[in-house]
Regions:
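A detector of single, family-specific signature residues
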Residues: 1-243
């Protein structure tokens, strides 16, 4: 019985459309086209055009995480290729187009000359997203405090040293009679208060993550390791078996 030809697929993903190329065992192009950048449409195209699929290879990028998980969920064997390393192979194409990039990715995954990039679980990405959002909020609070201090100096308002509520009380104590400046300081203090409320909400959410996640509980059991450090470590490592 004649062995069926294996297929390899390279999708070049963009926001609206994804260029897809299918190559056979010999690396020859047997189908190419474009489909909407929907996991269902991409998966359906792969199943139709590459019935003897061995592997799909796509570059890392902004949409790689959700698409990798979505395709895997539909039973499609897909690897993520480091964008910088894939770029070296794609430079060999005569003309850089989405169509040619898809062909280059299909040829690359056919060759096997690549190391797949580890994609973390969606739970880890969710936890990391909240942690990153909290970090941004903290930076925004610092920026707002510095702006308030700078404005106070500009208009000769003397603020006492202190952080948190002490700082806000200090600002309110020296609010000028000038209605424009008073309204400005009140507005900035209101923004700062809102940022702090959101930071506290993130703190509660992250504390819940740390309590409910087994790996976080293990890491945070070490002396001096709090929930934020535990989450940062666990979400960076994800699967210890890959090290």
């Amino acid at each position: 019985m004649e062995e069926k030809m294996k297929h390899f697929v390279g999708p070049d993903v963009s926001m609206k459309e994804t260029a897809v190329c299918v190559v056979d065992d010999s690396g020859q192009r047997i189908w190419e086209g474009s489909v909407p950048s929907s996991a269902d449409r991409i998966a359906a195209t792969i199943r139709e055009k590459a019935p003897e699929l061995l592997r799909v290879g796509m570059e890392t990028g902004p949409q790689a995480v959700w698409l990798w998980h979505a395709l895997r969920k539909q039973g499609i064997a897909v690897d993520c290729l480091h964008a910088r390393r894939a770029a070296a192979a794609l430079k060999l194409q005569a003309n850089k187009t989405d169509r040619n990039d898809a062909f280059g990715l299909a040829r690359l995954v056919h060759s096997g000359w690549y190391e797949p990039v580890a994609i973390k679980s969606l739970d880890r990405y969710r936890m990391r997203a909240v942690l990153t959002a909290r970090e941004r909020i903290v930076r925004m609070c610092t920026t707002m405090i510095n702006q308030l201090r700078g404005l106070a100096k500009t208009f000769g308002l003397m603020l006492s040293a202190g952080k948190g509520q002490v700082f806000e009380t200090s600002v309110r104590r020296v609010l000028p009679d000038d209605t424009v400046l008073r309204d400005l300081f009140e507005s900035l203090l209101s923004v700062l208060s809102g940022l702090k409320d959101q930071r506290r909400a993130f703190d509660r959410q992250l504390a819940r993550f740390a309590r409910e996640d087994e790996a976080c509980r293990i890491v945070s059991s070490a002396p001096g390791i709090g929930s934020l450090t535990a989450i940062a470590f666990v979400t960076a490592v994800d699967d210890p078996a890959r090290f």
